[in-house]
């Protein structure tokens, strides 16, 4: 049975979709863009955008009663793969700071993302 997850600690969906769905042991998190929940603003640089996206994913993970260690897959969409070294730096620090191993990951360059952001990530978690 699907259980919809919504939290005020992550941006509201900008379209007709849920922040996340829990189904038995799986948690599927919709693509998150770097909207700061408190201010509603989107920073300009890729490092801040990456950090906010990961922070938003963490908020959904916590609201779902999962942990960062439960994340098994992340898909990164970016408008500029030449900035992957910056994304990787923030990404690596996030998982180390949360005492987690690195989940599997794919990185895909796209022409454009919603609200003209530079990065979006979706995630999947599994918990026994």
Swiss-Prot record:
Pfam family, one: Ribonuc_L-PSP
Region forming the signal peptide: none
GO terms assigned for molecular function: deaminase activity
InterPro entries for this protein: RidA (IPR006056), RutC-like_sf (IPR035959), YjgF/YER057c/UK114 (IPR006175)
GO annotations of cellular component type: cytosol
CDD domains xref list: YjgF_YER057c_UK114_family
UniProt xrefs under SUPFAM superfamilies: YjgF-like (SSF55298)
Family recorded in the similarity comment: Belongs to the RutC family.
Name by which UniProt lists this protein: RutC family protein BUsg_359
């Amino acid at each position: 049975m699907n259980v919809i997850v919504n939290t005020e600690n992550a941006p509201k969906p900008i379209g007709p979709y849920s922040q996340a769905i829990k189904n038995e042991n799986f948690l599927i998190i919709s693509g998150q863009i770097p909207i700061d929940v408190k201010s509603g603003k989107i920073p300009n640089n890729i490092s801040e955008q990456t950090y906010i996206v990961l922070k938003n994913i963490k908020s959904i993970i916590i609201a779902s009663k999962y942990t960062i260690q439960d994340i098994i897959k992340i898909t990164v969409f970016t408008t500029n793969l030449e900035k992957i070294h910056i994304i990787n730096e923030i990404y690596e620090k996030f998982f180390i700071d949360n005492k987690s191993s690195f989940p599997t990951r794919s990185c895909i360059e796209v022409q454009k993302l919603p609200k003209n952001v530079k990065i979006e990530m979706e995630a999947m978690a599994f918990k026994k």
